[in-house]
Each structure stands twice: as structure tokens, then as C-alpha cells.
């Protein structure tokens, strides 16, 4: 690994992984350059980043951060980092695989919030929806309950005023 280009790539990978708690490893083999470019764009829109590198370098960078990926790093692999919205990035990967008749990119696994996860967990995460949509749903549920509570208090206040009159 004395190659200067490999050293530079490893340093870049280590820097990119610094502070990242959620990332996925995917097989991208079979995507055209245009499809790969489109995938990068959709991942970037969700606050993520796709990095293609040699498995050996990916493995070294992960081990440097105390994360071991072992068997998943076989065949062509790319790292997909989730900077902002882990579910949104997972959904972008899932949507891209559904568009492709070969099911590529194929998710091999990942780390979510620092915990190693398998393909099924990443697929479930992708089905959740984006962070913003989940937050909007939560706000809607809370505001509906608050509105009901205010209505109950108003009815009780009117009842008390009626008794005092």
C-alpha cells in the first residue's frame, strides 16, 4: 500500500468517515456512468455522499474508525455516507434499485447510528420516509391532540360559567 495515490485515497476516506455515524455499503457493478451520476445526485439531494474506492482502502478506513465490515466488502463496493437524513439516503438507494431492472445498487449492509446493521434493517429504514416527513407527521399528531385538549377545556370552562351564572 505504499502507492502515493492509495495513501491519498485512504486519507480522504478517513476524513470523509470522520464523525459519520450512518453509512451503507452497496454493490454498484452494472450501473452505467449516467446511472451512477444520477444515483450520486439523488443521494446528494438527501444529504448523503457516494464514494467509490477499492475494498482494501474502504476496509482500512473503516477499521481505523473501529468499525469492521468483514464479508460485505467482496466485489465492487461503494460507501454511501448519510450526513443528514439516514432514512432519506436509504430511500434514495432503494428507489434507484427499484428503477433498475437488475436491482442495482444492491445494499450489502451498513452502520446506523454507529451500530452494524444488515440489509433488512436498511430496507426497513428506507420504508420509513424522510426525517422531515416523519417530523411533519409527528407535529400533525401532536397538534390534533392539543386541539382536542383545548376543546375539552373550553367546554369545561363554559360549563363552569353556566353553573356560576
Swiss-Prot record:
PROSITE patterns: RIBOSOMAL_L10. GO terms for molecular function: large ribosomal subunit rRNA binding; structural constituent of ribosome. Pfam families: Ribosomal_L10. Keywords: Ribonucleoprotein, Ribosomal protein, RNA-binding, rRNA-binding. GO terms for biological process: translation. It comes from the Bacteria. GO terms for cellular component: large ribosomal subunit. SUPFAM superfamilies: Ribosomal protein L10-like (SSF160369). The keyword ATP-binding does not apply. Forms part of the ribosomal stalk, playing a central role in the interaction of the ribosome with GTP-bound translation factors. Belongs to the universal ribosomal protein uL10 family. Part of the ribosomal stalk of the 50S ribosomal subunit. The N-terminus interacts with L11 and the large rRNA to form the base of the stalk. The C-terminus forms an elongated spine to which L12 dimers bind in a sequential fashion forming a multimeric L10(L12)X complex. HAMAP family: Ribosomal_uL10 (MF_00362). This is Large ribosomal subunit protein uL10.
